[in-house]
């Protein structure tokens, strides 16, 4: 949301190669950073991206749009997500799909981790 959070996000954004063909505990593959957001890409391909995120309490992403459908799976914590003007509180173990081009935003109610899957058409 804030420019400070954006700066932390940019510094913490990492592309990392993860071992394939082994069992992964997704939530343990990403840490939290105080006052910030971290992302780690698991898979990046022309067909789409799968990215892990962690958000400290109160951090978030301001309203934006993406040209593709996106699935958010909350791994830990609680997040408020707005999609097309409707507020949803999403908890660990729950998911939500953002339709392509739908305005959406999120704010961490408490620290949370999520897996974002975006399939390109």
Label the predicted regions.
Residues 27-59, 120:
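A short glycine-rich, His/Asp/Glu-containing loop-to-beta-strand
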Residues 75-76, 91-92, 110:
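A cytosolic small-molecule/anion-sensing beta-strand core signal
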Residues 100-121:
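Ligand-binding loop in jelly-roll beta-barrel domains
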Residues 1-12:
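Single conserved hydrophobic/aromatic residue that forms the stacking wall/gate
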Residues 60-70:
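Amphipathic, hydrophobic secondary-structure cores in small proteins
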Residues 85-100:
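Short acidic-glycine-tyrosine-enriched beta hairpin
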Residues 68-84:
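Glycine- and acidic-residue-biased ligand/ion/polar-headgroup-sensing regions
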């Amino acid at each position: 949301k804030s420019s400070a959070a954006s700066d932390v996000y940019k510094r913490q954004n990492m592309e990392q190669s993860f071992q394939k063909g082994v069992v992964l505990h997704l939530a343990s593959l990403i840490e939290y950073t105080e006052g910030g957001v971290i992302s780690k890409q698991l898979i990046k391909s022309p067909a789409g991206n799968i990215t892990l995120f962690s958000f400290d309490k109160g951090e978030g992403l301001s309203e934006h749009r993406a040209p593709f459908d996106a699935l958010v799976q909350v791994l830990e914590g609680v997040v408020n997500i707005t999609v097309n003007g409707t507020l949803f509180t999403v908890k660990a173990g729950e998911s939500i799909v953002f339709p392509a081009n739908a305005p959406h935003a999120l704010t961490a109610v408490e620290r949370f981790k999520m897996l974002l899957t975006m399939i390109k058409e």
